[in-house]
């Protein structure tokens, strides 16, 4: 009883910052006004004379920034947008030398959002050729049982296969139901970073083959420190490697690796030949969309908060996807000035330019 009481007291001392809109679905039409209520509470009670930093405005382009003291721990404010998009409110409260944060985003006519990126004329040709060229390299797979990860229902392996060229390999964790049979399959694609992978054992236990891939061409069962060292060293900022050359851009081989992973599933696992899915979040959300768009074997896909989308939006002062390639450029004219001259075959204004050509996909039917 004493421990329970003490625990309750500790939890009751928590500082909580909330930001809430005046609509339950957080959705408005352009031109309408959203009302937000900010509250800073301690032990469930509004905190008097609390200092806060406030930032509000369009996502990634907040134009209201203030520091103020909330006498009664609460604040009401309004926001509106003339263009479809998202309005964000961020609040940081300063209490006893500590910072406590709250945030809220409201959507304005989100169904009317339009992409800024233009489909390159040679997009389909570029990717079809790249995939065909990669398939000239045999998968030449390897497979190693991981007994410490196996369960009574699932066998777990570290596998690898050649990707875009000989000796460049993709490593992954393969989970296969123990029971003999043909199964649906799920490709899991990763968010940004460098890390080991455990495999999706649970989904496999429910009767599906799962293949969780890494994208960096290194084994996925080493100690975490190895990945930290690589991420802070050779692979720091890998998402920007060779971004001016669509044939050498880091994500070209990553996307091709996803397609080769499907090839591996089709050829080397007891896949049923019918149900094939792909899923991932952030960077993995992008890879989910790209894989589903480029390979018609995919029958279901589940992207979660996809990154790497609509990069050129930032040239119009509108929120774009991570990693915000052009955020430091103020306008489309500045972007054009940074590109080669029109006579250059790598001219960024041409339909098949690298900045447009690497992150597109066929329309999903």
Regions found by a protein language model. Name each.
Residues 9-17:
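Proline/serine/threonine-rich low-complexity linkers at boundaries of modular beta-sandwich domains
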Residues 22, 26, 134-180:
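N-terminal cap/lid segment of alpha/beta-hydrolase-fold proteins
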Residues 80-85:
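Surface-exposed, short loops/turns at beta-strand junctions within beta-sandwich domains
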Residues 108-142:
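Low-complexity, Pro/Ser/Thr- and charge-rich linker/hinge segments at domain boundaries
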Residues 172-174, 182-192:
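Short beta-strand element of the alpha/beta-hydrolase
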Residues 195-259, 264, 312-322:
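Cap/lid segment of the alpha/beta-hydrolase catalytic domain
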Residues 271-281:
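Alpha/beta-hydrolase fold nucleophile elbow
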Residues 285-334:
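Hydrolase active-site cap/lid region
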């Amino acid at each position: 009883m004493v421990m329970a009481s003490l625990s309750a007291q500790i939890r009751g001392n928590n500082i909580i910052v909330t930001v809430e809109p005046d609509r339950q679905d957080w959705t408005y039409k352009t031109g309408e006004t959203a009302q937000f209520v900010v509250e800073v509470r301690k032990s469930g009670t509004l905190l008097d004379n609390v200092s806060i930093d406030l930032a509000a405005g369009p996502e990634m382009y907040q134009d209201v920034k203030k520091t103020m003291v909330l006498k009664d721990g609460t604040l009401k404010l309004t926001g509106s947008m003339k263009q479809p998009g998202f309005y964000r409110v961020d609040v940081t409260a300063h209490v006893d030398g500590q910072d406590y944060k709250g945030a809220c985003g409201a959507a304005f006519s989100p169904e009317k959002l339009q992409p800024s990126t233009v489909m390159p004329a040679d997009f389909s040709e570029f990717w079809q050729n790249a995939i065909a060229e990669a398939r000239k390299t045999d998968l030449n797979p390897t497979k190693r049982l991981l007994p410490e990860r196996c369960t009574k229902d699932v066998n777990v392996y570290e596998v690898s296969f050649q990707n875009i060229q000989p000796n460049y390999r993709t490593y992954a964790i393969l989970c296969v139901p123990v029971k003999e049979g043909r199964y649906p399959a799920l490709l899991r694609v990763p968010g940004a970073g460098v890390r080991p992978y455990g495999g999706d054992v649970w989904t496999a236990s429910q009767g599906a083959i799962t293949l969780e891939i890494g994208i960096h061409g290194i084994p996925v069962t080493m100690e975490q420190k190895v990945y930290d060292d690589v991420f802070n060293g050779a692979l720091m900022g890998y998402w920007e490697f060779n971004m001016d050359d669509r044939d050498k851009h880091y994500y070209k081989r990553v996307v091709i690796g996803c397609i080769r992973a499907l090839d591996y599933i089709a050829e080397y696992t007891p896949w049923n030949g019918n149900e094939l899915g792909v899923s991932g979040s952030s960077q993995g959300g992008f890879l989910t969309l790209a894989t589903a768009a480029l390979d018609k074997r995919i029958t279901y896909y589940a992207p979660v908060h996809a990154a790497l989308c609509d990069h050129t939006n930032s040239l119009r002062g509108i929120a774009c996807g991570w990693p915000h390639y052009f955020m430091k450029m103020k306008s489309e004219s500045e972007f054009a000035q940074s590109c080669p001259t029109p006579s250059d075959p790598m001219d960024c204004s041409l339909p098949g330019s690298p900045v447009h050509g690497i992150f597109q996909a066929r329309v999903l039917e």
